[in-house]
Amino acid sequence: LSKEYQELNLKGGRAYIRSDSFEKIKSLDAIIFDCDGVLIDARRSYDEAIRRSVQHIFTTLTHIPLPLSTIPKEAIYNLRLSGGFNFDWDTTYVIALVLFTNLPKPFQEAFSEAAKQIDREEALERLAEASSKLNNKLPKDYFEKNGKMLKEVLIRFTQSNPEDREAAERLILKSAEREGCVEHLKAFIEFLAYNSEAPRNMISIIFDTYFYGPKLFKELYGFESRLRVRKGLIEKEKLIVTEETLKALKEMLGEGRLGLATGRSSLATKKTLGDLLSYFNSQGMVFLEDLKYKMGGSESLIKPYVKPQPYSLLEAAAGIGDVNSVLYVGNSAEDYLMTKNANSVKRIFLFAGCYAIHNTRSKIIELFKGAEAALIIPTVNDLPKVLGYVRGVRGG
């Protein structure tokens, strides 16, 4: 692969520039960014919210604290590598189903029985009611003794690379059928009400309470969460992108040439990017989570718009205006798949992949090379230097 890529040593690591992309990179007239893992380090917010949500559901149901270590980050990253898990609600949901099917049969039976007697609309009321019927249904040392087994099951399942939430759900149902517990799993699926709107949808309510915290949650939903959380995990986010980088890119490309195509909500993006948002063209910003809330949180309605479908990238490019060569900067499989899908509609997109905040750097670099990314860079802050180099300005 070395001939296909020219390498450039930078302070933060090595950049790879695809040899046949030089001319296209030189003529770039816009750059559109993904947020998480590119502009914002969201590992301590989104990843943590997935784990806390699953922990909350199972600790409440079983009356036994589920250690966070039972839900390995590796399982989350494995699902994301497939390219079909752009919404962390999906990841949370799948992990919850896998855990449920691996709990002892007697507990699953007790849950099914309890669930039949519950008809509460509101997710957290349902959870409380189920919990009240399930005390002492699981040995008190269950998670202590079986935590390692559950963790391994999650890693194994996610390594099987289900392509999206629906594929994962089918696999889990099939395996539950083999184990003879499919009816219990169906009761659990119904209990989570994942295809319903808030406040019925348990995953969205619990996840968003942990992620946003009470104040932003209320701003988003218009009602208060019944789950008491002091501060949202969004407060733990850190910026990756610097103002210096955005300034340099604006100078290179001109005013209004930077856009966003992200799965985030505008609320979460504003909260963390703050004033830096002013560097982006307001017409060229697409927030898929906003669209999801507008559609009442409905999974089936949002599916045609979600990455790797090209909607957000095409829409952001159209918002920027007259563009002939657009670089999309992402950090995952779904980002490059989206670029590829957008090119089948309008052949104007190049992909740049950022790898430095990945836990498996070499794996992701290989993934991007295999996807023929135009650029592979440590972080977004290396972009001005690499673009300068390609344009023949070998910045010091």
Annotate each predicted stretch with a short phrase.
Residues 4-74, 90-93:
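Active-site neighborhood of HAD-like aspartate-dependent phosphohydrolases
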